[in-house]
């Protein structure tokens, strides 16, 4: 049975970020994606200039009311939220999550708590980080912070893999069943590898892959693709190990393809066959 995912995050007309990055790879893995855009920008913000607008929070609710009106909301298997244009959008998204779960009690809420990295040019509105700590975290079934976001959510420093597992379990105690730490960075075992953790109350899986060197300008949207693919694989019933291994390899294929084509924007279409069937393999280790 094909899974239906309501994906509520940013959209760029040119290039790949938010839904513009994740939607196609998720579909390539066999999911129906219902993209609902929190912002519509000309391009992602790391170019330093862009045009477009943040959607009014009521717009998100109105679109979902339309889906409910044609009696299709019960077919939604999960809500995915990513980049928010405002904290008020977050409150409306939680209302949407409640509405979806009322229609389908088995539906999951996957929160990608994008909180911004000013040094990278990723900017979020005031109040968004606080929204995730107070409201997004306890409402989520699955949450996918990077290291900086993990530290904000658990409200203390995380310096190594063991501390990251403990921090993930602190989050689990507040609501979610699954935590993906999308990028361990300085808390990982090795500075020259890209490492991730997938943690539940009683399991923790670690994986690493080579870093792909893009020089000064790292492509945007890698986390969005990672979250989207992870949600698809979880909904399809893969084990935690299978999920982590496939997602890591698929994202690596996109990165390698992008680098080989000497592009800055993620080359998700060019890499599509290797998203579905990666040529590389990375083994996850149970901690």
From Swiss-Prot:
Binding residues annotated for substrate, in chain numbering: 10, 45-46, 224
Catalytic activity: pyridoxal + ATP = pyridoxal 5'-phosphate + ADP + H(+)
Record EC number: 2.7.1.35
InterPro entries: PM/HMP-P_kinase-1 (IPR013749), PyrdxlKinase (IPR004625), Pyridoxal_kinase_PdxY (IPR023685), Ribokinase-like (IPR029056)
UniProt KW Flavoprotein keyword: no
Cofactor needs: Mg(2+)
Molecular function (Gene Ontology), one example: magnesium ion binding
Key words of the record: ATP-binding, Kinase, Magnesium, Nucleotide-binding, Transferase
Binding site for ATP: 112, 144, 149, 182, 209-212
Top EC class for this record: transferase
The organism's place on the tree of life at top rank: Bacteria
GO cellular component, one term: cytosol
The protein's annotated pathway: Cofactor metabolism; pyridoxal 5'-phosphate salvage; pyridoxal 5'-phosphate from pyridoxal: step 1/1
KW ATP-binding (keyword) present: yes
Gene Ontology BP, a term: pyridoxal 5'-phosphate salvage
Family: Belongs to the pyridoxine kinase family. PdxY subfamily.
Protein's job: Pyridoxal kinase involved in the salvage pathway of pyridoxal 5'-phosphate (PLP). Catalyzes the phosphorylation of pyridoxal to PLP.
Subunit structure as annotated in this protein's UniProt entry: Homodimer.
Protein name per UniProt: Pyridoxal kinase PdxY
Species the sequence originates in: Shigella sonnei (strain Ss046)
Gene: pdxY
């Amino acid at each position: 049975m094909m899974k239906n995912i309501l994906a509520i995050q940013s959209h760029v007309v040119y290039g790949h970020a938010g839904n513009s990055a994740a939607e196609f790879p998720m579909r390539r893995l066999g999911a129906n994606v219902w993209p609902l855009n929190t912002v519509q920008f000309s391009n992602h913000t790391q170019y330093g200039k862009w045009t477009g607008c943040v959607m009014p929070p009521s717009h998100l609710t109105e679109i979902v009311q339309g889906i409910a009106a044609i009696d299709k909301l019960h077919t939604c298997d999960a809500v995915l939220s990513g980049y928010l244009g405002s904290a008020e959008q977050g409150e409306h998204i939680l209302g949407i999550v409640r509405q979806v779960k009322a229609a389908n009690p088995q539906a999951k809420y996957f929160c990608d708590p994008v909180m911004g990295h000013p040094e990278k040019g990723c900017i979020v509105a005031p109040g968004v980080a606080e929204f995730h700590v107070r409201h997004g975290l306890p409402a989520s079934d699955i949450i996918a912070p990077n290291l900086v976001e993990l530290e904000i959510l658990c409200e203390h420093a995380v310096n190594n893999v063991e501390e990251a597992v403990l921090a993930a379990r602190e989050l689990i105690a507040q609501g979610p069943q699954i935590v993906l730490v999308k990028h361990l960075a300085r808390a990982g075992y090795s500075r020259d590898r890209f490492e991730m953790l997938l943690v539940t109350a009683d399991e923790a899986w670690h994986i690493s892959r080579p870093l792909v060197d893009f020089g000064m300008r790292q492509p945007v949207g890698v986390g969005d693709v990672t979250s989207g693919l992870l949600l698809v694989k979880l909904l399809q019933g893969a084990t935690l190990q299978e999920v982590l291994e496939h997602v890591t390899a698929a994202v690596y294929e996109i990165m390698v393809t992008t680098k080989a084509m000497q592009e800055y924007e993620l080359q998700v279409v060019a890499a599509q066959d290797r998203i579905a069937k990666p040529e590389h393999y990375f083994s996850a280790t149970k901690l």
